[in-house]
A protein has these predicted regions:
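Mid-domain alpha/beta scaffold segments of enzyme catalytic cores
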Residues: 1-254
């Protein structure tokens, strides 16, 4: 059964049919989903979905792009939310310099404070790193007790090796299937099977042959098939391995 370790069913793109989509997942071979929050509202929604659906778990956190809504009450809210049942991680947190380079200092502060909370609560983190590889790596190296996954990993093979050496997991999703993405094969070549997680980032980044459509967890089969081919194992074996990896990181009993 498939473990989608990163899907945003709290996203507005699912407003029309959220519950129907989620209810159909077990019949489509999806056994577990982690829904990470991106701010206070989405973190609350992720927690609510985790309470409603037995196979959904939540992560709570403030995405770097949501810096405008970060305020003096944000950490207190996250501290409260991460004590709720079925919250298995702090995330989605990190740095994003693709859209915004004017607020790097604030993004770093948000990232570091949430890393500290994760360490305090003994929770893994889900890291967003877009066009900020050097700073993200430097920050997590400054927090050696932190553990977790670099979601939608887009760094180099050398960065991957350094993170793996430090016990981190790497998340792979739809872009792995894109013909233009040569870097994914290079990274997967140096990534041990036991450090691979699969994810959709639903509703975004649908894999080939569904690129451009709304993504959901059932489409993870295409990502699993591609990674399995690159690693020389069957899709069934890759599904089993990635489920075990996800359960190990997030402390979930399959």
């Amino acid at each position: 059964m498939i473990f989608d370790t990163h899907a945003h069913y709290d996203d507005k793109k699912f407003d029309a049919d959220r519950r129907e989509v989620l209810a159909a997942m077990p019949a489509k071979g999806v056994s577990l989903i982690v829904d990470p929050g991106c701010d206070g509202e989405s973190s609350r929604t992720a927690c609510a979905l985790a309470q409603e659906f037995p196979f959904v778990y939540a992560a709570v956190g403030w995405h770097p792009e949501e810096w405008q809504s970060w305020n003096g009450e944000s950490m207190a809210l996250l501290r409260s939310l991460c004590a709720q049942p079925k919250v298995v991680a702090i995330g989605e947190i990190g740095l994003d310099y693709y859209w915004d380079t004017e607020h790097k200092a604030l993004q770093k502060e948000m990232f570091e404070r949430q890393l500290s909370l994760a360490i305090e609560r003994k929770l893994p983190v889900i890291v967003h790193d877009r066009e900020a590889h050097g700073d993200c790596l430097e920050i997590v190296m400054n927090y050696p007790e932190a553990r977790g996954v670099f979601h939608c990993f887009s760094g180099s093979a050398e960065m991957a090796k350094e993170l793996i050496r430090r016990g981190w997991y790497l998340g792979f999703d739809g872009p792995v299937t894109y013909k233009s993405n040569k870097k994914a094969a290079e990274v997967l070549a140096v990534t041990p099977l036991e450090r691979i997680l699969v994810e959709t980032d639903s509703p975004y980044m649908a894999p080939e042959p569904c690129r451009g459509k709304r993504n959901d967890s059932s489409l993870l089969v295409y990502v699993l098939e591609k990674i399995a081919a690159l690693k020389g194992v069957s899709a069934e074996e890759m599904t089993r391995i990635t489920q075990e990896n996800g359960c190990r990181l997030f402390g979930i009993e399959a």
